[in-house]
């Protein structure tokens, strides 16, 4: 019995030791690793790429022989340092451009072969985007950079151009605008990164700031531009006012003409009705009709009481009868 107990204890010790050794090997050499949804891994053997993994789950490697490096599979953010750049065109104004970008690893094999680490990736992105920004910005006038349409900038606040758009037609007509310029920067930057497995997804001009030496002159120029636009709007308003007043006068004359025509028509109808009534009255009592007509004539003739007439006239036969 004692022999059996000792044998069992020895077996338990051996099993325990084996488990501890296995766990130690697993913790040191890590032949198993977990790949997350937003990650991609590359496995190398003696510096050569063996395989890549982009599906989440448990993954395996050969300890001491294979190495695994994990990289993000998501779109990443890049923030550049503000750059002092002269604009294109005739103005050649110095401005500060602050840009941000989004990028991703498009080809893990190229990325690992040429760069290998994320820190070096950001260095290469700096070298790809910043020259592209300088080159593109230097080709265009300031208004092309800060506008995305022909609507003018409404205000300048603390030296920062705010792309707040209005409905007033500006004097300068842009041909491309900020959005197209950003796309041009993306295209050039991608040409610079296509050999290293990086894709520049988007580049945004986050802020455009005038150089301090130019703020006063730019303020004066923008005031002058606003005054020109205001004068243009006043001219448009006066033209519209003249047109509206002309329409009102035309409508008034039309209404008056129609009213006069209607009044003449009504008067004619009234005259006809009066003539009809007079005719009926004349037919019924001729003497009374003559008397009534005489009274109406007296009203018209004798308005001025200072007139002197002879009563011997037949006209006054109803006022004075001879004996």
From Swiss-Prot:
A Pfam family that the UniProt record links to this protein: Band_7
Top-rank lineage group of the source organism: Bacteria
Keywords linked to the UniProt accession: Membrane, Transmembrane, Transmembrane helix
Record InterPro entries: Band_7, Band_7/SPFH_dom_sf, HflC
GO cellular component, one term: membrane
Membrane topology field: Single-pass membrane protein
Localization annotation: Membrane
Coiled-coil regions, chain positions: none
Cross-referenced SMART domains: PHB
Residues spanning the membrane: 14-34
Family listed: Belongs to the band 7/mec-2 family. HflC subfamily.
Alphabetical list of PANTHER family matching this protein: MODULATOR OF FTSH PROTEASE HFLC (PTHR42911:SF1)
Purpose: HflC and HflK could regulate a protease.
Subunit structure of this chain's protein: HflC and HflK may interact to form a multimeric complex.
Protein name: Protein HflC
Organism in which the protein naturally occurs: Borreliella burgdorferi (strain ATCC 35210 / DSM 4680 / CIP 102532 / B31) (Borrelia burgdorferi)
């Amino acid at each position: 019995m004692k022999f059996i107990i000792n044998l069992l204890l020895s077996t338990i010790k051996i099993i325990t030791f084996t488990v501890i050794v296995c766990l130690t090997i697993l913790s040191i050499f890590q032949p198993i690793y977990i790949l997350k949804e937003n990650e991609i891994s590359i496995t190398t053997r003696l510096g050569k790429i063996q395989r890549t993994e982009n599906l989440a789950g448990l993954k395996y490697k050969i300890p001491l022989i294979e190495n695994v490096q994990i990289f993000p599979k998501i779109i990443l953010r890049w923030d550049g340092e503000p750059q002092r750049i002269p604009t294109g065109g005739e103005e050649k104004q110095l401005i500060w451009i602050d840009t941000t970008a989004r990028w991703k690893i498009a080809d893990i094999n190229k990325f690992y072969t040429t760069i290998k680490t994320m820190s070096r990736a950001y260095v290469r992105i700096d070298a790809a985007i910043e020259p592209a920004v300088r080159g593109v910005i230097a080709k265009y006038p300031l208004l092309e950079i800060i506008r995305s349409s022909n609507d003018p900038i409404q205000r300048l606040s603390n030296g920062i151009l705010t792309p707040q758009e209005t409905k007033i037609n500006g004097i300068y007509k842009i041909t491309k605008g900020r959005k197209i310029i950003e796309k041009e920067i993306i295209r050039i930057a991608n040409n610079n990164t296509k050999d290293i497995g990086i894709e520049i997804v988007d580049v945004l001009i986050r802020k455009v700031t005038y150089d301090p030496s130019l703020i006063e002159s730019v303020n004066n120029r923008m005031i002058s531009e606003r005054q020109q636009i205001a004068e243009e709007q006043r001219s448009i308003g006066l033209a519209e006012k003249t047109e509206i007043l002309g329409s009102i006068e035309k409508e008034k004359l039309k209404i008056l003409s129609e009213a006069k025509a209607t009044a003449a028509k009504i008067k004619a109808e009234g005259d006809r009705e009066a003539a009809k009534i007079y005719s009926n009255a004349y037919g019924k009592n001729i003497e009374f009709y003559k008397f009534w007509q005489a009274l109406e004539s007296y009203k018209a003739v004798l308005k001025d009481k200072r007139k002197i007439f002879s009563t011997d006239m037949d006209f006054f036969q109803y006022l004075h009868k001879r004996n």
